[in-house]
A protein has these predicted regions:
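Hydrophobic pocket/interface hotspot
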Residues: 51-52, 61, 83, 100, ...
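Beta-strand/loop substructures that line and gate deep hydrophobic ligand-binding cavities in soluble
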Residues: 3, 112-167
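Short Pro/Gly-enriched beta-strand edge/turn motifs at strand-loop
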Residues: 24, 78-83, 107-112
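A short, structured loop/turn motif at beta-sheet edges
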Residues: 48-49, 101-107, 128-137
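Short, surface-exposed charged micro-motifs
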Residues: 41, 74, 99, 124-128
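Hydrophobic ligand-binding cavity/cleft-lining segments
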Residues: 2-71, 190
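A generic structural micro-feature
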Residues: 32-34, 75, 90-94, 117-121, ...
C-alpha cells in the first residue's frame, strides 16, 4: 500500500478507505522537530454507540483488532485505565500497551500506545466518533510516531484493522435490519 505524505495537516481530511501518513512539525513548529502522524476517516453502517462499544469492550476489540485468532486484548475504557494488545502475526507476537488518557462516552477516546520490542517510545491514538444519519463516522489520528518503520507498520495495521472493524459491524447491522424486516412482516401478516 503506498504511503501518502503531506507537508502540513489538511484541516478537514477526506473520508477514504486508507489511512494517510503525514509528516509535519511537532508542537511548537520547529522544523528540526518533526513528527509522523497517521490519519484515517471512515463511515460505518452502525450507530455511534455500536462503534464506540467496538473500541471499548474486550470481546469486540479481540474480534476486529487482532491479526488472527491468537490475538488478545485487555481494555479498561476509563481515564487512567490500562490496555494491552497481543497481536499475533505469523510467528511474531506484537505486544502493545498503553493507558487511556481521556474518554467521552460515545464521542471520543484517547490512549497512549507503546509497541514493545519494536520501539519503546510511546505515541498517542485519538479516536473521535460521530453520527451521519443512520451511519457513524470514525476519525482516527495516531500521532507522535517515532520512526518511519513504525509508521509503515501502523499504516498496515490500521488499514487492516479498520477493514476488519467494518466486517465486524456489518453482520450486526445486517442482523438488526433483518430482524426489523421480519418484525414488520409478522405485524403486517397479523
Amino acid at each position: 500500500m503506498p504511503l501518502e505524505s503531506f507537508e502540513t495537516s489538511p484541516t478537514p481530511f477526506p473520508i477514504g478507505d486508507r489511512p494517510m501518513l503525514e509528516y509535519g512539525p511537532r508542537g511548537g513548529g520547529d522544523a528540526a522537530e518533526q513528527c509522523l502522524r497517521i490519519r484515517a476517516r471512515r463511515v460505518f453502517p452502525a450507530s455511534r454507540k455500536e462503534l464506540f462499544a467496538a473500541w471499548t469492550t474486550r470481546p469486540a476489540c479481540e474480534s476486529w483488532l487482532g491479526f488472527r485468532a491468537h490475538s488478545r486484548a485487555v481494555v479498561k475504557p476509563y481515564a487512567g485505565g490500562a490496555f494491552r494488545l497481543e497481536l499475533a502475526e505469523g510467528p511474531i507476537i506484537h505486544v502493545i500497551t498503553g493507558s487511556t488518557v481521556e474518554v467521552r462516552i460515545g464521542e471520543f477516546v484517547s490512549f497512549t500506545w507503546i509497541h514493545h520490542d519494536r520501539d519503546d517510545y510511546g505515541s498517542i491514538v485519538d479516536v473521535t466518533f460521530g453520527q451521519r444519519g443512520d451511519q457513524s463516522e470514525l476519525c482516527l489520528v495516531h500521532h507522535a510516531i517515532a520512526s518511519r518503520r513504525e509508521a509503515a507498520w501502523l499504516m498496515r495495521l490500521w488499514a487492516a484493522a479498520l477493514d476488519r472493524l467494518e466486517h465486524y459491524l456489518v453482520p450486526r447491522t445486517t442482523r438488526r435490519v433483518a430482524s426489523a424486516v421480519a418484525a414488520r412482516r409478522t405485524s403486517s401478516a397479523a
